[in-house]
Amino acid sequence: MKVRRNVRAVLLDGDDLLFLRRGWPGGPSYFTTVGGGVEPYDADLEAALRREAMEEIGATLGPVAEFLTVTEPGERVTVVQHYFRADVLDMDLSRRNGPEMDDPDLGNFSPVRVALDVTALAALELQPTELADYLREHIGEWRA
């Protein structure tokens, strides 16, 4: 069985959480985290996360901490999602790069700031549900 590892970031930007609104022309949009697949050239999960943050939102991250792992078994591939919490140190959308930015068929990615509270999170319909459930239960612990 092949295993595919992905890294995902729940980002804190000041007093807000930062997510991505992902959408396609003529299709529904949804909210998700910054992140993607770990590539063979990534030194480790953290390096992959930092690369994805730069590619998708042009962000430099502070220290990262893994808080949740979700395993999605499949017939041919098992996907392991590693979720990290990190502060955004700076962000410049003009620094975005990577395949997502070059191929319109992959949709668009727009950063969205959300208040650091349960009500705002519930309104997002954040995917996947395991992450949304975890955040609703623990978000109070993330306040400074």
Regions found by a protein language model. Name each.
Residues 4, 12, 33, 77-81, ...:
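Short connector loops at helix/strand junctions that flank enzyme active sites
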Residues 38, 61, 88, 116-119:
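Hydrophobic pocket-lining residues within nucleotide cofactor-binding pockets
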Residues 1-18, 69:
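Conserved N-terminal beta-strand and adjoining loop/helix that marks the start
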Residues 16-56:
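Conserved Nudix-box catalytic region and its N-terminal flanking loop in Nudix hydrolases
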Residues 60-68:
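A short coil-to-beta-strand element that immediately follows conserved catalytic motifs
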Residues 72-100, 109-117, 130-141:
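Active-site-adjacent beta-strand/loop module that shapes the phosphate/pyrophosphate-binding cleft
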